[in-house]
């Protein structure tokens, strides 16, 4: 028996996953009286984004009445973005108000949170952090170099100059900085001079020059009387890497804000997740029996591991802000996890029904299922890496690797998109661990147990039962209808967009931010309707909060648009609100007309990122499927993908939902999901070409392969759509329209993905091949 001696692997793997799931969700903490010490972070320690748990709103203005130019404000915006990402604050909105020379920042934080100090973060964000090296020990000494000549800074701990170990900052200079530092140290070594290092007006280190330093590096150490702590060097390295502000900033106002998705959004999503996982477990077990049940155990481990990477469960990985787009990345990764298990279970079932023994079916099923799983996951990894490179911090690994693609846009970040890429990449890599490795260990272990060796537990038919003959659908024969329908659908979506109009969020267009104070409680939807009528805009977003300094309750109204809002219009708004709701006593606190947080450059960069990802995917498909004309197949896959993206766009238009960062995340999710569906179909075509050779025409080959892949494609999509469907229902029950307008377009895009992967991409491929063949003849 080939699986003899492996039964213990099933028990051990299940126990390890169960222990990991428990600790990942609940953490490990010891309570001693009233004091609780956390040793391992759990799901409760996840820092959720502003959209889910609320946060703080800060307005920065130049210190001492400094008159900043538009270019300086834009430069300050970039530095603050880099500092936020360095602090692992990836969910933020940062706007510039050029009229009042202010920067308005929102980032997540919850009252009572101890792992993150918002006031310390605000202080660090607003610090100028101008690094200089000067000759001598005074602040007016001759400048040797500044922070712009530093390529990177890293916090280190170890022996310095042969003495005891201490914390220090290791610097690596640019070529220009290395030359300047080498020249200065060579000269000062000969004269016995010193070099002092300054951060703003603070002398952080002064040292005698004992040798010429020409290797392009240096270290910043502390004095013996005031040694650096680990926190000191980490903060200093972070500030140096993020760059210096062009002017000093002062906090003008500071207030808390409520979740933009609603107070109950997190509870709703947890409930939706539990229900969705239960339904997936029932479906997988019903369809695939024992392998389906074991797949759900592995899937639970994958979900827990993804949350562990976000919560800071692993000490080597810092906690990460989880936003709605980040949750979308997890959903997509879960879909990929289900897909890997469905492919494997389907292959095992096929082998059993072809007459193979259980051991033979497992061996063959695992081997034949691995290639499509890898191919599908690689396409998702490509998307995730491009997103992290395009929208992550400029000193990040992927940003440096892809600098040659995005250098024209300058260094810029988009935290929510970066978070999406992070959770997506993490989830897909974990899919290899749980969806492939863990599942296979458990199935092999189960097959080694005598009571679990009945082939029917793995999908085989009962003895003597003849499998029902599967009816072949002539997908390729209907290609003209499919292609015509897709063309008409996209034309209809364009027409709807023209007739109904496309609503862009403040993130893209800029607009006005009106902050009001109020008393007592009110019905949000009613106030939103009144405000919309008073301002003549249907795209308003309302958030409640509290001013930290005064304790006043605040209402922030965001109004997208390119035209400024005047004080007279704000007065009209106040008159309407106070007339309709006299008990609330609305009063104006501030008015800011802001530029777009994600403006033209962001849209251009998004387009380049998508195109670059598609080019890489096309190249991968062309290489992997070169024996069956992979380049043409890749082009047809990209063409079919446009259908899916248009469906997502059209759904947003029909729902009259504003296009914002969540829209970008939804589009990127469908890009990865749909391409994966198509690649799995292509993999079956390649396999059948090897089996059938020239016995079948290309049309017959494609049609046979699509029929074989249809069940897997439909089941995978049903499980993911089921999760999104539950989210839609729960969000409606909880009155969370923002979640619904995110989940529903995703669901429609995935349904479109089934259609295009089975009916459009392959049909277009056959039609192209026929036309190409006709030209040759």
In which residue ranges do the predicted regions lie?
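A structural signal for conserved, well-ordered secondary-structure elements
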Residues: 1-777
């Amino acid at each position: 028996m080939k699986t003899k001696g492996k039964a213990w692997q099933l028990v051990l793997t299940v126990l390890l996953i169960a222990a990991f799931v428990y600790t990942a969700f609940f953490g490990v903490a010891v309570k001693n009286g009233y004091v609780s010490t956390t040793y391992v972070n759990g799901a409760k320690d996840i820092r959720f984004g502003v959209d889910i748990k609320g946060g703080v709103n800060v307005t920065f203005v130049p210190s001492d009445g400094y008159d900043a130019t538009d270019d300086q404000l834009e430069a300050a915006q970039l530095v603050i973005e880099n500092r936020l990402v360095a602090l692992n604050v990836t969910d933020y909105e940062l706007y510039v108000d050029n009229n009042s020379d202010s920067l308005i920042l929102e980032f997540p934080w919850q009252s009572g949170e101890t792992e993150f100090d918002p006031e310390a973060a605000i202080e660090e964000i607003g610090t100028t952090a101008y690094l200089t090296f000067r000759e001598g020990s005074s602040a007016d000494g001759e400048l040797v170099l500044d922070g712009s000549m530093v390529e990177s800074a890293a916090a280190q701990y170890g022996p310095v100059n042969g003495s005891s170990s201490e914390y220090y900052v290791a610097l690596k200079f640019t070529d220009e900085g290395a030359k300047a530092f080498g020249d200065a140290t060579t000269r000062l070594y000969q004269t016995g001079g010193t070099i002092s290092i300054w951060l703003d007006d603070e002398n952080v280190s002064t040292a005698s020059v004992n040798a010429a330093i020409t290797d392009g590096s240096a270290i910043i150490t502390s004095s013996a009387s005031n040694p650096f702590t680990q926190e000191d060097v980490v903060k200093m390295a972070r500030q140096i890497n993020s760059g210096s502000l062009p002017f000093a900033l002062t906090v003008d106002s500071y207030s808390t804000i409520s979740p933009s998705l609603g107070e109950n959004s997190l509870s709703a999503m947890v409930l939706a997740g539990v229900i969705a996982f239960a339904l997936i477990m029932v479906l997988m077990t019903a369809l695939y029996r024992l392998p389906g049940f074991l797949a759900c155990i592995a899937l639970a481990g994958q979900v827990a591991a993804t949350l562990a990477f976000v919560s800071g469960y692993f000490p080597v990985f810092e906690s990460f802000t989880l936003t709605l787009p980040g949750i979308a990345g997890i959903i997509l990764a879960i879909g990929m996890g289900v897909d890997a298990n469905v492919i494997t279970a389907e292959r095992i079932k096929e082998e059993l029904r072809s007459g193979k023994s259980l051991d033979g079916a497992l061996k063959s099923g695992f081997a034949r299922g691995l290639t499509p799983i890898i191919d599908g996951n690689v396409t998702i990894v490509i998307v995730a890496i491009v997103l992290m490179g395009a929208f992550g911090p400029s000193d990040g690994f992927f940003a440096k690797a892809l600098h040659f693609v995005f250098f024209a846009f300058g260094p810029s970040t988009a935290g929510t998109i970066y978070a999406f890429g992070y959770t997506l990449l993490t989830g897909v890599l974990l899919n290899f661990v749980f969806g492939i490795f863990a599942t296979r260990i458990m199935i092999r272990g189960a097959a080694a147990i005598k009571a679990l060796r009945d082939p029917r537990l793995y999908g085989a038919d009962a003895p003597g039962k003849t499998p029902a003959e599967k009816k072949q659908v002539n997908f390729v024969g209907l290609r003209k209808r499919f292609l015509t329908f897709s063309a008409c659908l996209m034309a209809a979506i364009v027409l709807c967009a023209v007739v109904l109009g496309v609503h862009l969020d403040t993130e893209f267009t800029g607009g006005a931010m009106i902050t009001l104070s109020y008393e007592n409680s009110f019905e949000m939807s009613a106030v939103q309707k009144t405000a919309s009528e008073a301002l003549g805009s249907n795209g308003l977003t309302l958030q409640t909060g509290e001013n930290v300094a005064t304790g006043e309750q605040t209402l922030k109204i965001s109004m997208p648009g390119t035209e400024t809002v005047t004080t007279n219009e704000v007065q009209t708004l106040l008159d309407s609100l106070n007339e309709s709701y006299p008990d609330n006593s609305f009063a104006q606190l501030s008015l800011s007309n802001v530029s777009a947080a994600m403006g033209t450059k962001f849209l251009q960069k998004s387009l380049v990122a998508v195109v670059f990802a598609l080019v890489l995917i096309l190249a991968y498909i062309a290489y992997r499927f070169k024996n069956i004309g992979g380049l043409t197949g890749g082009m047809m896959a990209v063409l079919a993908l446009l259908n899916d993206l248009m469906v997502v766009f059209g759904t947003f238009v029909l729902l009259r939902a504003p296009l914002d960062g969540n829209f970008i995340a939804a589009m990127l999710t469908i890009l990865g999901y749909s391409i994966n569906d198509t690649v799995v179909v292509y993999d079956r075509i390649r396999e059948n070409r090897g089996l059938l050779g020239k016995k079948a025409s290309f049309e017959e080959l494609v049609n046979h392969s699509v029929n074989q892949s249809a069940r897997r494609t439909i089941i995978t999509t049903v499980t993911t759509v089921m999760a999104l469907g539950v989210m839609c229902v729960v969000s409606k029950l909880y009155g969370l329209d923002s979640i619904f307008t995110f989940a529903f377009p995703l669901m429609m895009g995935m349904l479109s993905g089934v259609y295009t992967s089975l009916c459009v991409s392959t049909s277009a491929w056959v039609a192209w091949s026929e036309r190409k063949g006709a030209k040759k003849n």
